[in-house]
Amino acid sequence: MHESHLVVILALLLLALWCLSTRPVQPSCHVEINGHSIIVTGNCWHSTQRPH
């Protein structure tokens, strides 16, 4: 069953769209897929941390 791969791909697409929507000025969120390893670079994670 390759459903797990489809779920991962959909999750990456949603993450990419969300990162682009949260930072429309500087879309520096980059996602690479090498085999089964997922590499996420950029300041995408910094934009998700909001001070309470």
Swiss-Prot record:
Membrane-spanning residues: 4-21
- Tell me where in or outside the cell this protein is found: Host endoplasmic reticulum membrane
Main location as per UniProt: host cell
Query: What does UniProt give as GO cellular component?
Result: host cell endoplasmic reticulum membrane; membrane
* One example of a Gene Ontology biological process annotation: transport of virus in host, cell to cell
Annotated function: Plays a role in viral cell-to-cell propagation, by facilitating genome transport to neighboring plant cells through plasmosdesmata. May induce the formation of granular vesicles derived from the Endoplasmic reticulum, which align on actin filaments.
Name the protein family.
Belongs to the Tymovirales TGBp3 protein family.
Name by which UniProt lists this protein: Movement protein TGBp3
The organism encoding this protein is Foxtail mosaic virus
High-level lineage = Viruses, Riboviria, Orthornavirae, Kitrinoviricota, Alsuviricetes
